[in-house]
């Protein structure tokens, strides 16, 4: 697969990746995804208000000289959630390093051994496939099966 994808595709993948990544404390030391997802969700909620306040305060005080700076601040505030979603989309389409790919295969085989159906294993897995397998593992495997990895 071509790793160079458009910005719109990356944003869509980022939103999907944000939904499928398991938000588990065991994964915090290993992956930055949980921190990025939390920051991005916070930015989605807060940054539109920051953008509006930065422009509206200049309008209320009739400070036309500071309006260009307020607009730049508003644009920057509005870009922060997009940057987080773009990063997640880019990360979702990145191939796993060899160590993580073998970990993905082990976890995949463990899930299949316990009798759960998964989509076919990927020869060159990406982070989004790892997220799907991790999500399934945390939902369907018991704690004793997960002890080896966490």
Curated annotation (Swiss-Prot):
- Where is it localised? Cell inner membrane
One GO cellular component term noted in the UniProt record for this chain: plasma membrane
Name this protein carries in UniProt: UPF0208 membrane protein VC_1099
Q: State the membrane topology.
A: Multi-pass membrane protein
Q: Which family does it belong to?
A: Belongs to the UPF0208 family.
* InterPro entries, alphabetized: UPF0208
Q: Which UniProt keywords apply?
A: Cell inner membrane, Cell membrane, Membrane, Transmembrane, Transmembrane helix
Q: Where are the transmembrane segments?
A: 42-62, 70-90
- Domain of life per record: Bacteria
């Amino acid at each position: 697969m071509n790793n160079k994808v458009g910005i719109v595709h990356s944003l869509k993948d980022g939103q999907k990746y944000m939904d499928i990544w398991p938000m588990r404390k065991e994964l915090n030391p290993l992956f930055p995804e949980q921190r990025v997802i939390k920051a991005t969700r916070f930015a989605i909620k807060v940054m539109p208000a920051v953008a509006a306040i930065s422009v509206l305060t200049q309008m209320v005080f009739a400070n036309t000289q500071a309006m260009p700076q307020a607009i730049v601040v508003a644009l920057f505030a509005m870009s922060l959630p997009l940057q987080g979603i773009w990063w997640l989309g880019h990360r979702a389409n990145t191939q796993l390093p060899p160590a993580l790919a073998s970990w993905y295969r082990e976890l995949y085989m463990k899930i299949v051994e316990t009798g759960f159906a998964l989509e076919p294993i990927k020869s060159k897995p990406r982070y989004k496939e790892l997220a799907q397998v991790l999500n399934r593992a945390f939902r369907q495997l018991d704690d004793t099966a997960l002890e080896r990895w966490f």
